[in-house]
Amino acid sequence: MPYTFENSEALLKNLKDAAPYISAAERFASFKGFVYDKRINIACTSEKLARAGFYSTASPEFPASAKCPFCMLEINFEQCDDPWEKHKSGSPHCEFVMIGEIEESELSFRIISNLAIRHATVRLYEELLGIVATLENGDIANENPITRADATRKLISFRSSSKLLTFDHRLATFQNFIFDKKRNVKCTSKKLAKAGWFSIANKKDKTSAKCPFCLVELDFDESDDPWEEHQKFSASCDFIKLGKLDEKKWTENEALMLGARITIMQKYEKGSWLIDELEKENRIDEIIKIRKIMIKPNHVLKRRRCSI
């Protein structure tokens, strides 16, 4: 598929729809009438919260509550709190936190896209939690717009899109795997499937496999250890970070999050290819254009701050 600006523009528009709080400006806009903004010389303002990765989840009971769309950390802030320090201490492995305090204008197209995909994954996970709760409770809460029929349809669709979550489904993709006929080899179909891989073999690349959680593809040799190779080439993969090869040891929430990750990665797989093409060709002008679709400039924050 040849690269065009329209391709990437459509990709990022879809990502932005799936990740509504990707930019500081959009997070800032969620803090309407924030309780501490009318006070002088305080550490915790709506602007600082937004720049630290939080959007408002305020309620009458918790008027200073905010949440990170990338790691789900939710805090009811005090006016003396430093939002960035609270985020770092409360969720040090959050992808947003690990980037550091960098201006959005300095973030690469790849980083912005990865954050959007993480945000979309978390958002789907939270939606799925609501669906599961709806079906388990047997009734619909007044504030929940999901009907049982809607919940059932969405869960069936999710199961279909996340089949490669399980070892058995990944193993089933390795039909007549070439190394299985040999003795004393490290790289077997069972070891590949257990390490998170599914087969994408063809006549040319008979030992190719891919991870549905991170989309890394490798051509394996019979002496390769599938788990070690996965760690080596994709240390940030969600499956690798969980570190539980035995899926029987997964908690329900861990399985649901991994399933959400697969679904989102499938949805934006072609988009990942577009990003690769942009970076290979070093098309700076196009990258700047499409990055603006995702991230609003900082003066949006400053303009609203001056108008309060």
Swiss-Prot record:
Q: Which PROSITE patterns match?
A: BIR_REPEAT_2
Any single biological process term in GO: mitotic cytokinesis
BIR repeat positions: 27-98, 170-241
Q: Which Gene3D superfamilies match?
A: Inhibitor Of Apoptosis Protein (2mihbC-IAP-1), Chain A (1.10.1170.10)
- Cross-referenced SMART domains: BIR
Q: Which GO terms describe its cellular component?
A: chromosome passenger complex; cytoplasm; kinetochore; spindle midzone
Q: Which InterPro entries match?
A: Baculoviral_IAP, BIR_rpt
Going by the UniProt record, its keywords in alphabetical order are: Metal-binding, Repeat, Zinc
Q: What CDD domains does the database record attribute to this sequence?
A: BIR
The positions annotated for binding Zn(2+) are C68, C71, H87, C94, C211, C214, H230, C237
Q: Which Pfam families match?
A: BIR
Keyword Manganese listed? The answer is no
Q: Which GO terms describe its molecular function?
A: metal ion binding
Q: Does the keyword Repeat apply?
A: yes
Q: Which family does it belong to?
A: Belongs to the IAP family.
Protein name per UniProt: Baculoviral IAP repeat-containing protein bir-2
Q: Which species?
A: Caenorhabditis elegans
